Amino acid sequence: MRQSEPRATRDLQAPAGPLDAAMRRYLAKLAIRWSPLVACALVLALLVALSSVPGVHKAARASQLAARSGLARPSGTYRSSTMATRGSAQGGAAGSNAAGSSGGGSNGTAYGTPGQAGYPTTGTATPPLAETATSGGACTPGAKQFAWSVYAPPCVPAFHGNNGGATSHGVTGTTITLTYRLANSSQQAIIDSVGGAAVPSQHAYLQDLQTYAAFFNTQFELYGRHVVIKAFQGQGDYLAEDQGQDLQGAQADAATAYSLGAFGDVTFLLTSSQPYEQDLAAEHVLSFSPTGMPQSWFDSYAPYEWSIWATGTKIAESYVNTVCGRMAGMPAVFAGSAATRSQTRRFGLLTPDNPEYVRVGSEIQAGLRHCGVSLAKSETYSLDYAQASQEGTAAMAAFRADGVTTVLCMCDPVMPIFFAQAANTQSYYPEWVVPNYLDPAGQQVSSSQWSHAISIDGWPMPPAGQGEAYHAFELAAPGKQPAEQYYMVAYYTMLQVFEGLQAAGPDLTPASFAGGMASLPPSGLGQLGTWAYGNASYTPPTNTLIEWWDPSATSNLDHKQGAWVACDGGKWVTYADASSWAPLHQQLGCFAPPG
């Protein structure tokens, strides 16, 4: 077994008291393994524990945070006549869902489709009948495997014949085994007691995984096999692992997954760790938990690492294309002071000092240099939140002194609170270009700063109780509700797994899984954008929305004031295609009115 590469991230300097130490470590983990759909609710809940850190807004009740998780269904209608099961009564018939909000903010902007502004849904409307399929039957040209997902793969006819039996570790003639590591940490009890309902229930999440797996077993062509999920109690401390500690525990758990016959592992992303994922690869077990890692990391562990979230490299591309195509060489018209709005933009970059963010920050700088943009200032900060106020003050003072008009904040979910407070204190009101940690997180940041913020990786967020993941659960378990509030993560993770299993064909191996994924055509447009793979693509999202923060808009997530609203009429932009940011060298169509 190959030695896991220890993460270079240093442990946080914990203040006195085990509760503060645990909270700071867990918040650092959320920052490292950021997934906006999950992290924002957890971060806001866990900030309750940081009473020793000055200036942090108290989180709302945990029960309210559950509604803030962003697990929303895009509006659209599904045809019940095209839904078919493959021998299971669980399948049910697809219902009809009334059209909901277009996802716009106070100015009525609708989310769109690539190259087309104002498209009112996110691509989940029923496809034409000629392109729908009945799972497991004969396939017509252009048919999809099923009609209930915009991400449905091409139809595969029902398989009859010899599937080759045990074609790979974790595969038999009748089963494909996935494992799930139940998290273990000496500090888990503290995390659970403070976070309350906002902390994911591992057993509830596993239950939802099992529900989706049972349904997908009837919908995808698995060539005589079916997926089984085996859970085991982890030995390693997942919080310590992501700080470069207890690496032997991660190795032991990867060995356990292998001994259980794992072909792949579907551990929840926040209770996985980079060392565990790397050790799974050393055991030749696929992992579906990585989050925010650069493309180079996925390449180095191919074909074993997969994720439903965009790579850090794709996020860097979004920063570069936004700056180079729509901001550089023009006045900082979205800044908060009149004097700054008349100045040509000068950019400053902020990133945490852990290796993953530093690597992504380097990719941003390289891309900017390619289009002739030099940073006026670049700063890193630690994830020691006990020093957050001091570091925020220092960073904003440096940016202000160097005339930075536009802050590129490739930041974790917490530090923008402190940066904004420090900027206010110094009467410094720049433009902000930031990741999107969803509306509830944005509501925690001073609106005098965030009302000048642009997000480079947005998603449409229709009203709660809607979305493809919820609809699929209704089909999987009629009359029941998902057990875990983060069920959408379970849904899209299992969807990715099953797409690869079907595309691999009967001779299932890690290599054929990767080859099958590479062969899949691009999907339609859904809540997570358009999915596409191709060679050396291990994360499917290809596009995103540019958004602006409207402090007056009502959020679809928590019904409070403050929400992200689409720029440019809701046009989707493609990470790798700078031309999709058109009209180039013109100000973004953000705010009301722009400029």
Task: Describe each model-derived feature in a short phrase.
Residues 15-45:
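N-terminal export and membrane-targeting signals
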Residues 45-73:
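C-terminal region of N-terminal signal peptides and the immediate post-cleavage residues
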Residues 137, 259-378, 431-456, 461:
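Extracytoplasmic ligand/sensor domains, especially the bilobed periplasmic-binding protein
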Residues 140-145, 150-165, 521-595:
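Solvent-exposed, acidic/polar segments of extracytosolic/periplasmic ligand-binding ectodomains
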Residues 185-191, 199-230, 370-373:
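Signal peptide-proximal N-terminal region
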Residues 204, 219-301, 381-389, 417:
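Beta-alpha junction/loop-to-helix N-cap segments that form part of ligand/metal-binding clefts
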Residues 309, 422-492, 587-591:
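Extracellular/periplasmic periplasmic-binding protein-like sensory domains
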Residues 412-418, 460-521:
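Extracellular/periplasmic ligand-binding modules, especially the Venus flytrap/periplasmic-binding
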